[in-house]
Amino acid sequence: MELFLAGRRVLVTGAGKGIGRGTVQALHATGARVVAVSRTQADLDSLVRECPGIEPVCVDLGDWEATERALGSVGPVDLLVNNAAVALLQPFLEVTKEAFDRSFEVNLRAVIQVSQIVARGLIARGVPGAIVNVSSQCSQRAVTNHSVYCSTKGALDMLTKVMALELGPHKIRVNAVNPTVVMTSMGQATWSDPHKAKTMLNRIPLGKFAEVEHVVNAILFLLSDRSGMTTGSTLPVEGGFWAC
């Protein structure tokens, strides 16, 4: 199915690894013009070699002022993928201020800031656009040791709906994708233990974790005009986890 993304300028955060990197690669293959944002210069350097022509931006999105400097003059952006996130997992009784602050700075506050920058540009140009927020199955189901992470993703789902409500009159669609575990470097850090993985897999009717391409395909669909009547949605890519 043709998604007609060629020539569109797309900003992707968390572009250095995992889902973000896969999204950049897929967008580049469609002919889209990609602005790839990561806090790790080495990841951006290797990504530029793989996808010549993309525009790399190295910034820590947890730093509001640095983000404003890096992206405030990024130029016209048609589509946005808010993928950057951290997963600092602690038992509830051991949650630290540092983990809480860092998690909400990157997983929620940065989404607001980057989306404001992109949406204001779209509105000023008088053109439609689309934003996809990468959330999680943890936004709607509790997982042990994920109290802060689950909270950031639950907040992100509601933010997605409010953004859709307020930006809809400007013809800007906003949706979320909610994947199950994906065995990226972040996923492996948490779920590589077979016993722990089994406890999660037992809650997934399809009995498997997601691949990066499963999530990327959902993101590209929501960016494209093929989903032109879809906004404010949370699209599960979780093998039926929410059905249980």
From Swiss-Prot:
The keyword Phosphoprotein applies. It holds the Pfam family adh_short_C2. GO terms for molecular function: carbonyl reductase (NADPH) activity; identical protein binding; L-xylulose reductase (NADPH) activity; oxidoreductase activity, acting on NAD(P)H, quinone or similar compound as acceptor. Its EC number is 1.1.1.10. Belongs to the short-chain dehydrogenases/reductases (SDR) family. One of its GO terms (cellular component) is plasma membrane. This is L-xylulose reductase. InterPro entries: L-xylulose/Carbonyl_redctase (IPR051737), NAD(P)-bd_dom_sf (IPR036291), Sc_DH/Rdtase_CS (IPR020904), SDR_fam (IPR002347). Substrate binds at S136. It comes from the Eukaryota. GO terms for biological process: D-glucuronate catabolic process to D-xylulose 5-phosphate; D-xylose metabolic process; glucose metabolic process; NADP metabolic process; positive regulation of reactive oxygen species metabolic process; xylulose metabolic process. Homotetramer. NADP(+) binds at residues 11-40, 153. The modification Phosphoserine is found at S46. It comes from Homo sapiens. It is an enzyme of class 1 (oxidoreductase). The active site is at Y149. Changing N107 to L/D: Loss of function. Probably due to defects in formation of the active site and binding of coenzyme. The gene is DCXR.
